[in-house]
């Protein structure tokens, strides 16, 4: 499959493809953007990087679960978790217990952290998850090979 293809020379329409996942039956699933000009290497990189960033953001926001409950990691929630953790550490747990809402609006799960060890377990797993998602995204962006886009 061509990653860069002119699909209409008269209208100067080009398609850029990335994240190609080939299946056993020979077909493939991929992302694609159609442009009204032949993109430069930097445009291709920017397009693909932006998509990888969006995928990482979505995974961070809604891909983490703790004790089998989904945890919504919005920027605000990340800040609240960090603030609660930092305060608990600084006061040697005197600010505990602290309760967070996990799950969904339809099926909320309220989790109360009674001990510093308990809260530390949650917070370190949250941070590790975010770091793992970011690291995977960086690897994908670093692996963009513009030589595969030569038309």
Model region roles, listed by residue range:
Residues 2-151:
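A preference for well-ordered globular domain cores
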């Amino acid at each position: 499959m061509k990653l860069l293809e002119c699909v209409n020379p008269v209208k100067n329409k080009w398609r850029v493809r990335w994240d190609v996942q080939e299946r056993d039956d020979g077909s493939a699933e991929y992302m694609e953007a159609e442009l009204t000009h032949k993109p430069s290497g930097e445009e291709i990189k920017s397009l693909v990087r932006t998509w990888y960033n969006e995928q990482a953001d979505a995974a961070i926001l809604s891909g983490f679960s703790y004790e089998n409950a989904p945890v919504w990691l919005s920027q605000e929630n990340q800040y609240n978790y960090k603030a609660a953790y930092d305060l608990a550490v600084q006061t040697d747990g005197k600010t505990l217990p602290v309760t967070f809402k996990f799950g969904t609006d339809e099926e909320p799960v309220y989790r109360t952290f009674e001990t510093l060890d308990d809260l530390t377990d949650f917070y370190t797993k949250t941070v590790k998850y975010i770091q793992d998602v970011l690291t995977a995204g960086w690897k994908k962006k670093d692996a963009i090979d513009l030589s595969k886009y030569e038309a």
